[in-house]
């Protein structure tokens, strides 16, 4: 029982780290003006909009979906993006996956804590563990998709304007920790089934 609780607490902790990373992504420009998923030619791109720092400081409205290719960067900088403006506009509509992944990681963080209180000693807990594992698989898929969207949309060929190492580390955390959580829940399933088997043979 103690091992099972520790596994759930560790799982919740990993999801908390992943949730923190996505929360930082959601707070980028224009919510926090100087924070962005990518900066190029005086434009800071965020999840819900952008801010321009060149000449005069101005920000777009907070929108769930916005056109990331609307701001035409001066000079040849438009050609230095990995993707064309049309492709960036299409992928920009998928930025909604970031708040979706944020919500899923928060639920995945809170659910193991709830399961600890619902756990019945001597009872069958396979359904609780299975439902939690399914949720974490969905969370993993959403985090991988959201991180892929961010990388495709924000990566720039100019090394100076590529997302900072700090942002890339957070993206790695967001996609890695849910994968670790699935392994942790596999262990919890083994603990629960082995405990039930021992009770049947005793």
From Swiss-Prot:
Q: Could you identify this protein by its name?
A: Protein DCV1
Q: Tell me where the signal peptide lies.
A: 1-18
Membrane-topology annotation of the record: Multi-pass membrane protein
Where is coiled-coil annotated? none
Species this chain originates from: Saccharomyces cerevisiae (strain ATCC 204508 / S288c) (Baker's yeast)
Where is the protein localized? Answer: Membrane
Offer a single GO CC term for the protein: plasma membrane
Major location category of this protein: membrane
Q: Describe the disruption phenotype.
A: Leads to lethality in absence of CDC28.
């Amino acid at each position: 029982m103690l091992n099972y609780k520790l596994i759930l607490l560790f799982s919740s902790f990993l999801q908390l780290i992943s949730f923190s990373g996505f929360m930082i992504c959601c707070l980028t420009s224009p919510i926090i003006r100087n924070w962005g998923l990518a900066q190029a030619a005086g434009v800071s791109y965020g999840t819900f909009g952008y801010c321009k720092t060149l000449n005069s400081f101005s920000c777009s409205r907070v929108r769930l979906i916005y056109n990331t290719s609307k701001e035409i960067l001066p000079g040849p900088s438009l050609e230095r993006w990995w993707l064309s403006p049309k492709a960036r506009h299409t992928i920009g509509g998928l930025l909604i996956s970031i708040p979706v992944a944020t919500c899923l990681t928060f639920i995945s963080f809170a659910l193991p804590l709830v399961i600890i209180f619902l756990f019945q000693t001597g009872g069958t807990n396979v359904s609780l563990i299975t439902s939690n594992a399914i949720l974490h698989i969905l969370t993993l898929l959403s985090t991988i998709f959201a991180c892929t969207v961010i990388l495709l949309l924000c990566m720039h060929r100019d090394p100076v304007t590529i997302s900072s190492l700090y942002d890339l580390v957070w993206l790695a955390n967001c996609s890695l920790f849910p994968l670790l959580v699935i392994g942790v829940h596999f262990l919890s399933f083994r603990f629960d089934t082995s405990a039930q088997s021992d009770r049947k043979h005793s």
